[in-house]
Amino acid sequence: MSDEEIRNEYTILERSKKDTQAFGELYEKYFERIFTFIYRQTDDEDLTADLCSQTFLNALSHVNKFEFRGVPVSAWFYRIAANEVNKYYRKKKSTRVFSIEEIRVKELVEISSNEYNEELIQRLIGYLKKLPTDMLEVLELRFFEDKDFKEIAYILNITESGAKMRTYRALDKLRKNFNLSIKYDGKK
């Protein structure tokens, strides 16, 4: 997202402090992305709908507290959504669910055509689901949500170097356990 697009979103958010109708533009733009982000962590449409509604309700009710930090407004929504999901699982004391799409795993891993097989992808998905939550969160945001490290740091309330380190460690585990080449540039 360009700096100009980020500033435009920030302007809309500023307008929504006085006119809640303006918030609708951001809601329309990001609802589906936030819904999908939450759904991957719940695998339950009704629960996802509730948590997504709560995410946007919290954002709207706290719009006056929003501070611009150079990241897209979407990062703020993702942060609220991540907090809502964490709060839900803490309250329920249940195991977190991660629904990982096979197609996204195929995009993540560079597999030459002669090495590719369905069994490998299924084993990889199973392994990803067993990763510690902090590692899976960064992989999801980085590769499935296409967030840069600055946004990941903001969403997870960690430093940018912490986001890079978690990503590197998670990918290193995958490389070692599956002897795979993983798409990772470490820059963005």
Predicted features by range, described:
Residues 27-46, 62, 128, 177-180:
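Amphipathic, Lys/Arg- and hydrophobic-enriched alpha-helical face
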Residues 19, 118, 128-136:
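Short helix-coil-helix linker/hinge
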Residues 1-33, 186-188:
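N-terminal module of bacterial RNA polymerase sigma factors
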Residues 50-57, 71-83:
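Structural recognition of an alpha-helix C-terminal capping motif at a helix-to-coil junction
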Residues 87, 95-121:
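Internal acidic/polar
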Residues 65-68, 79-99:
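Arg/Lys-rich amphipathic alpha helix in sigma70-family domain 2
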Residues 10-15, 123-131:
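Short amphipathic alpha-helical boundary/capping segments
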